[in-house]
Amino acid sequence: MVTKLLASRGATIQELNTIRKALSLLKGGGLAQSAYPAQVLSLILSDVIGDPLDIIASGPTVASSHSIQECFQILTTYNLLSDMPESVHTVLSGSPVEQATQKDFSHVHNVVIGSNRLALEEAKRQAEDMGYFSVLLSDTVCGEVSTIARLYCLLIQLTCLSATAGNDLLKDKVEGELSSLVAKLALPGLHLRDILRASQVEKPICLLAGGETTVQLRGNGKGGRNQELALRVALELHRARATADGRFLEKYEIVFLSGGTDGQDGPTEAAGACCSQELVGEAEREGFNVEEFLNNNDSYTFFVRFQSGHHLLMTGLTGTNVMDLHIVLIRAKGRD
């Protein structure tokens, strides 16, 4: 109940795990302490941005770096303090959890064997083998899906504009908005120079990024963050293309994909979805109102009904989770 309430308000995975650690005997280093003095080897699959060992799986073999006061602050931020069960208040009202010293965990060896970065690096190799000029943008993408959709729309526009003669004023405008948004999102390691360099090659382009977005629930539809992100990117591209300045996009084939590496996006059977810049126009001609589906957080229903689910990413459960992968493919029309 606690994590569902937090997730519905847009809490990050870091915030969710901070609360989980405070409410568990095994999380936050509890498992390692229970095993002491036996040697402990922990093989870790990271599903958290930045791979912080004390946050992944709520850190059962890592000393906790958070206090009870931080838990109260998180619950207050999302206006959930009064909605918590009495049992939660009882636990959190206890004495602050003292941070264990490093020597308490000298018997523990933690090794990250899988992460979003590793998945992206392998995807990059695969794309290059398929003939794409690939750029790994970031493995720390996070934020509300509508903002991230705007980010990807601007990245796509800048990539295409950089490969198109003229349009210098529009390119400067797009690059300026993109730079401001990147700074606002505080995405470390996302360098626009890599995109500009990619635009100068003759190969089709593959932009790769990963992380974990959040969805602000406003409706009662069915969907997941990856499907909603794909649908919002499609809408952003549709709007950009509909303007007089956006006609340059018609010269390119563009595909965006967002998928969860665990094979399940929200309470759906899909891992995510893909879209093109033509998707919204095609949907409108078939009688679908994309904005209505988005306003109801009903992206899965849209993708199931639209073209018989052709745009859904169906992998089945993978048995692992290293967050989400975002892939953009750009190819100039008429170029093999």
Please tell me what each predicted stretch does:
Residues 1-10, 64-79, 218-256:
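Gly/Ser/Thr-rich active-site loops/lids in small-molecule metabolic enzymes
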Residues 1-13, 112-113, 125-137, 216, ...:
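Alpha/propeptide regions of enzymes that mature by internal proteolysis
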Residues 1-19, 53-55, 60-88, 258-270:
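Glycine-rich phosphate-binding loop plus the immediately following alpha-helix
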Residues 1-55, 60-63, 298, 305-309, ...:
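Glycine-rich, mobile lid/loop segments that gate access to catalytic sites or pores
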Residues 12-20, 80-99, 129-143, 161-185, ...:
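Flexible, glycine/charged-enriched surface loops at secondary-structure junctions
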Residues 35-41, 57, 62-166, 185-190:
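Accessory alpha-helical/coil subdomains and C-terminal extensions
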Residues 145-154, 182-198, 215-229, 266-275:
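Short glycine/threonine-rich loop-to-helix capping motif typified by GTGT followed
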Residues 234-336:
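Internal helix-turn-beta structural module
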